[in-house]
Swiss-Prot record:
Name this polypeptide is given: Light-independent protochlorophyllide reductase iron-sulfur ATP-binding protein
Gene that encodes it: bchL
Molecular function, one GO term: oxidoreductase activity, acting on iron-sulfur proteins as donors
BP GO terms, sorted: light-independent bacteriochlorophyll biosynthetic process; photosynthesis, dark reaction
Ranges for region Disordered: 1-23
Classification via CDD domains: Bchl-like
Residues engaged in binding ATP: 43-48, 72, 213-214, 237-239
Cofactor note: Binds 1 [4Fe-4S] cluster per dimer.
Residues that coordinate or bind Mg(2+): 47
Protein EC: 1.3.7.7
Stored Pfam families: Fer4_NifH (PF00142)
Source organism per UniProt: Roseobacter denitrificans (strain ATCC 33942 / OCh 114) (Erythrobacter sp. (strain OCh 114))
InterPro entries (UniProt xref): NifH/chlL_CS, NifH/frxC, P-loop_NTPase, Protochlorophyllide_ATP-bd
Length: 299
């Protein structure tokens, strides 16, 4: 049986009975652009992956907008070279009167013309990240910033399954998961798959695949993917050059042409081409927690 023919397992907390959702404003739909949301375990390298992917799309001649969806607001700093103000910060300055804002107040130019926005978020333990994402998209539409955009990338906070996690899925065509060749990262990926599968019952989003990041090998990632019917669509090795690029506040496309960096750039370009050309909508069957331990646990 094809993985696409499997019925996803019944999940507690899925859309429907007992599920509290941040509902999409119909006027805030993103139309015309291809939209990708990037997920993964906290600290796995989502921002590095998102920024270099945005840069790769721009090198292919695409008009790109990256939206950081984390209160840390560091998603785009390798594109812009700085920590830019968040939408929430800017709204506070005008006492939450968005009509007083100009696009240049919250949209910043990054490497090779990539447009950069940091949605920000409420202080820890307060507010709703989903509301912040929704307001950011609404502002972008009001200022016509989405009309001349080919690709939108949402870089989403950690592996928290809440309104902030779900809001980008309301806009995305495909969800991409950043993982590594270790138990904790794959365990988080399994839970993210379950959450995205639940959301895809009501939204158009489908899973595109995963990126093995900061990993010398991919054997455990591949074993998991083979088991659940998922795909690894890129591999970014564990290179010190990638860490150096982040310390220098630059994308890999701005770093010296070392052989290792050139190879990783090629992988990002290949990933961008794969996503632009379209990926098969995957429907993996996430494993129960006990089965994950049995699959990946030590003998």
């Amino acid at each position: 049986m094809s993985p696409l023919d499997r019925t996803p397992p019944s999940l507690r907390g899925q859309d429907g009975e007992g599920s509290v959702q941040v509902h999409q404003d119909e006027t805030a739909k993103i139309e015309g652009a291809k939209v990708f949301s990037v997920y993964g375990k906290g600290g796995i390298g989502k921002s590095t992956t998102s920024s270099n992917l945005s840069a790769a799309f721009s090198m292919l001649g695409k008009r790109v907008l990256q939206i950081g969806c984390d209160p840390k607001h560091d998603s785009t700093f390798t594109l812009t070279g700085s920590l830019v103000p968040t939408v929430i910060d800017i709204l506070k300055e005008v006492d939450f009167h968005p009509e007083e804002l100009r696009a240049e107040d919250f949209v910043f130019d990054g490497f090779n013309g990539v447009k950069c926005v940091e949605a920000g978020g409420p202080p820890a333990g307060t507010g709703c990240g989903g509301y912040v994402v929704g307001q950011t998209v609404k502002l972008l539409k009001q200022h016509h910033m989405l009309e001349d955009t080919d690709v939108v990338i949402f870089d989403v906070l950690g592996d928290v399954v809440c309104g902030g996690f779900a809001a980008p899925l309301q806009h995305a065509d495909r969800a991409l998961i950043v993982t590594a060749n270790d138990f904790d990262s794959i365990y988080a990926m399994n839970r993210i798959i379950a959450a995205v599968q639940a959301k895809s019952k009501n939204y158009k989003v489908r899973l595109a695949g995963c990126v093995a990041n900061r990993s010398r090998e991919t054997d455990e990632v591949d074993r998991y993917c083979d088991t659940v019917g998922f795909n690894r669509i890129a591999h970014m090795p564990d290179l010190d050059a990638i860490r150096r690029s982040r310390l220098k506040k630059k994308t890999l496309f701005e770093m010296p042409d070392d052989e290792e960096i050139v190879q990783v750039r090629k992988e990002y370009i290949r990933l961008a081409e794969t996503l632009w050309n379209g990926t098969e909508p995957l429907a993996p069957a996430p494993l129960p927690d006990r089965d994950i331990f049995e699959l990946l646990g030590f003998d």
